[in-house]
């Protein structure tokens, strides 16, 4: 029976950005502990992924690749986005806060961590060059193309070909998909298929939507979000929609941990038994405090994956691996 079942897939993607991903919403001192914790989180994740034979995609902001400030400034795109809200652009004064190199500034550089991920055999994907916001007013599709090309250039300099793409802040913009494909991207992470997760610009987010998503993390409000992954909408570019954001451990909500785990594992089981794909995602900095508790919670998820993989045709694949397997099936 096991051999006759359609294969299900377990996908993990991580939005690797450190301070570039939150610089427009949080002061450095507000989030310092989480960001510093990334230096311990990455080795912890890689250890668990190796232990449970997990393939993951680290969608990395291009600015993290640089070895020093001189290389970074030389690698900036010539054409930069002109957001209506200049505060969200890193090009409007933020580089004055960037230190000389990774030794001096662990918040804006991560070449040693990228090398660690690369050597572990995990996929390094793309989360744009500058944590680019694809739905904000003022920026254009050509700005986006130049940003993506800048990310490709620095990745290629490190021997990495970017094939998988994540929209920063989940600002999914369908109009930009052809640019991704033209620049060599073969898969992207779409948003969950519910009004709760519909892509919006920052000003359109509401407290009700955020509260509803929080409730959905503990109770099945919006469904399992398991998908049959195809490239039918855009041949050659595979949409691998998100299923669940892995929220970090909360000291205030610790009594709901069993519900949070069940919300995830029940959907994983649904994917395994129906030959569908379950896509879990989060940021390494989400695990940056309460590291022990967060990694222990993740290990429970991976143990459940291990059980499912033995009972059903359920495999762990990176975004690139899933896109390649679909291509080979044609």
What label would you give each PLM region?
Residues 237-253, 283-285:
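Active-site clefts of carbohydrate-active enzymes
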Residues 1-164, 169-240, 257-279, 287-330:
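Catalytic alpha-helical scaffold of carbohydrate-active enzymes acting on polysaccharides/glycoconjugates
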């Amino acid at each position: 029976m096991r051999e006759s079942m359609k294969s299900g897939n377990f996908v993990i993607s991580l939005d690797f950005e450190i301070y570039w991903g939150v610089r427009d919403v949080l002061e450095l001192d507000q989030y310092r502990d989480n960001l510093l914790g990334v230096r311990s989180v990455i080795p912890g994740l890689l250890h668990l992924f190796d232990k449970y034979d997990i393939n993951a995609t680290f969608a990395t902001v291009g600015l993290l690749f640089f070895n020093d400030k001189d290389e970074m400034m030389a690698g900036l795109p010539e054409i930069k986005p002109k957001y209506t809200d200049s505060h969200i652009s890193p090009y409007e004064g933020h580089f004055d806060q960037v230190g000389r190199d990774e030794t001096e500034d662990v918040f804006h550089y991560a070449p040693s961590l990228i090398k660690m991920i690369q050597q572990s055999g995990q996929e390094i994907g793309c989360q744009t060059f500058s944590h680019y916001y694809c739905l904000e007013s003022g920026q254009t599709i050509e700005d986006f193309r130049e940003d993506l090309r800048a990310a490709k250039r620095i990745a290629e300099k490190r021997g990495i070909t970017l094939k998988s793409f994540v929209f920063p802040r989940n600002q999914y913009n369908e109009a930009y998909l052809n640019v991704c494909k033209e620049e060599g991207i073969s898969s992207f992470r779409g948003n969950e298929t519910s009004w709760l997760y519909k892509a919006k610009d920052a000003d359109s987010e509401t407290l009700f939507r955020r509260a509803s998503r929080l409730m959905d993390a503990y109770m099945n409000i919006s469904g399992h979000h398991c998908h049959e992954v195809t490239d039918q909408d855009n041949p050659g570019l595979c949409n691998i929609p998100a299923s669940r954001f892995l929220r970090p451990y909360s000291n205030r909500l610790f009594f709901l941990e069993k519900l949070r785990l069940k919300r995830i594992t029940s959907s994983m089981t649904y994917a395994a038994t129906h030959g569908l794909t379950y896509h879990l995602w989060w940021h390494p900095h989400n695990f940056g405090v309460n590291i022990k508790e967060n990694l222990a919670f993740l290990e429970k998820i991976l143990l459940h994956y291990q059980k499912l993989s033995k009972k059903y045709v359920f495999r762990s694949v990176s975004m690139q691996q899933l896109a390649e397997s679909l291509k080979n099936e044609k």
